[in-house]
Amino acid sequence: KNTVDMHDFEDAKDKIYMGPERKSMVIREEERRATAYHEAGHAIVAEILPGTDPVHKVTIMPRGWALGVTWQLPEQDQTSHYKDKMLNELSILFGGRIAEEIFINRMSTGASNDFERATKMARAMVTKYGMSDALGVMVYEDENQSGFFGNVGSRTISEATQQKVDEEVRRILDEQYTVARNILENNKDIAHAMVKALMDWET
């Protein structure tokens, strides 16, 4: 091949972002279907909620460390993050696990990274960004402050206040989980159609 076309650029971009394809990996049909529902859950919630980054690609082709990927691309550079969009991003993160619960009635470990990211984001909203009405605009934790054993973070609040922080983080996560679940419960036909397409075409 003597020329480079857009397909080559797209493949290169996918490899950088998602890792190389693992075409030799043998995946059971049941697991492929579970992955398809997981990724469809992310994509449907992302498409329906307002103000989210557009879904660029959804794939169940194993790449890098993942069995599947839902890839959103912003339409413009972002220098600030806003509360409404961050809340929607939490719902998108939950979409994968909820789709597993609704459509295959099983839970996999594939959502662990989603939960970790969601928990960190919700906690930052409460403790760093002043986005909790219950706790106000005070910064409650400084994760960058060096402790006696190095950069271990610092908890500068009482146990009672920490409990309030934890309760507020839980409230935010629970509310956005409910948002995502309602979306998927009301769009089952779209989910089934998307899974069929992913099973047929992989991307």
Residue ranges and their predicted role:
Residues R33-Y37, A43-T203:
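Soluble catalytic regions of large protease machineries
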